[in-house]
Amino acid sequence: MALSTLNREVIKKNLQNEEYDVVIIGGGITGAGIALDASQRGMKVALVEMQDFAQGTSSRSTKLVHGGLRYLKQAQIKVVAETGKERAIVYENGPHVTTPEWMLLPMHKGGTFGKFTTNLGLTAYDRLAGVKKYERKKMLSKKQTLNKEPLVKKDGLKGGGYYVEYRTDDARLTIEVMKRAEENGAEILNHTKSTDFIYDSKSKVRGIEVQDLLTGEMYEINAKKVINAAGPWVDEVRKKDYTRNNKQLRLTKGVHVVIDQSKFPLRQAVYFDTEKDGRMIFAIPREGKAYVGTTDTFYDNDKTKPLTTQEDRDYLIDAINYMFPDVNVKDEDIESTWAGVRPLILEDGKDPSEISRKDEIWEGKSGLLTIAGGKLTGYRHMALEIVDLLAKRLKQEYKLTFAECKTKHTPISGGDVGGSANFESFVERKVEEGKAIGLQADVAKRLASKYGSNVDKLYNIAQIAQDKDLKLPLELYVELVYSVQNEMVFKPTDFLIRRSGKLYFNINEVKQYKDAVVEELAKLLNYTQSQQNEFTKEINIAIEEATRGNEQLAVLK
């Protein structure tokens, strides 16, 4: 049926009339992964997300599927081993949203990593994470380090480590996982809030009450089991249940800044320590920009809208100018920013960066299953663990049996390209097909690289659109229409922030075409005038918040 906004009413009707094996609360990467795993095993799955997919934490990360080198420093061996192996699986199943990226780790006198510890750490990392032979670490001299990135601070430089991480588009990874779950039969809806639980006569959870936040409509979804995968909202969801353990979340905030490469001509991804507190942060080139982050501070304010403060901006500017002294970045050079919250499990007495990124599953007396903590990279394994438990409970309580987990070798939506080894030749072939229908080679390459095996649908839209009088560039129009028809975009922010990433990496294009995007969506989705006004205001606020230092307190008073 496709994960289409145009199918909202049909999906809503199904959600009201069917009974599901499981209903999942939360449409970030964790919920998406669970929906994929459960549906792949043959379970009847429903999922609701109160905002847009990936709007919480899953669109606001450092955009790396990585093995977590820094966790070696904290002796979190299991985390390194598991996430290192998982990142290879994520890449193989979705090479259109994940790309290997060589990372430079400069070693300076008095820095976090010396030559011995870097060599030892990266060797252990290679072995624990099961790194492919051609991607194993290299140790570089001072000269070799500067050849890789001439902007790195020369004073005290002793050399560098060189190892592979995987760059991703976190929000697109989430939507592609979600689309594959829908292809398996999962019923999925965004902008739909879980408001309460439904219980049977034995006080066991048997579904949820929800509200469509676009229409105000309330209805029930019946299910044998409920999984709470609400990320930062896990505790709020559990509070609606009558049973809960003494565990709770501790949120921390992470901020990234984006600078044009004309000002910060970074040619190489770099992982470096800051002067102020010795924390490790990333500087990564992407699409003509360089983005830098992340901060790590305790946060207890509005979870739906964590903002970048002036203090956050200053911290990252200082970090850039410390490691790249010739750049001399100023506040006005920052084009865009994003802030996100990490839903970590509380560990008393620990600083933000010391709290473990491990995940945990909690089971209430009501039967409610909750998954908390975890990392973007580990989403598939987290899903495997909780769906194994779900299958066990469905067998015990309902005598139902399901297949084992299959997601290790399941391409996500767009990933049917013949594996990572064939992705480059797949893109080349699709570029030729795009040129044959009149697309510019660079446009065809961007579309094929971004959408993988789904690109034919975008080409079909492009062919129809070529004869139209468009207010948008053809490429932008094609992506917009596709996102409505296949990725459940309803609001301009859904598209301009999460499906395209343009608010972060091409904010000038957002400023130029935002009104035309609103107009096009109004036509496609029959906005009321009040909706059109509201959504125009929403994107203008998003632009303002991304481009300035905000005065948001870390703790809500």
UniProtKB/Swiss-Prot annotation:
Principal subcellular localization: cytoplasm
EC number(s) stated in the UniProt entry for this protein: 1.1.5.3
Entry binding sites for FAD: 21-49
SUPFAM superfamilies referenced in this protein's UniProt entry, alphabetically: FAD-linked reductases, C-terminal domain, FAD/NAD(P)-binding domain
Pfam family name, one: DAO_C
Record bears the keyword Nucleotide-binding: no
Cofactor entry: FAD
UniProt pathway annotation: Polyol metabolism; glycerol degradation via glycerol kinase pathway; glycerone phosphate from sn-glycerol 3-phosphate (aerobic route): step 1/1
Compartments reported by the entry: Cytoplasm
This protein's name: Aerobic glycerol-3-phosphate dehydrogenase
Organism: Staphylococcus haemolyticus (strain JCSC1435)
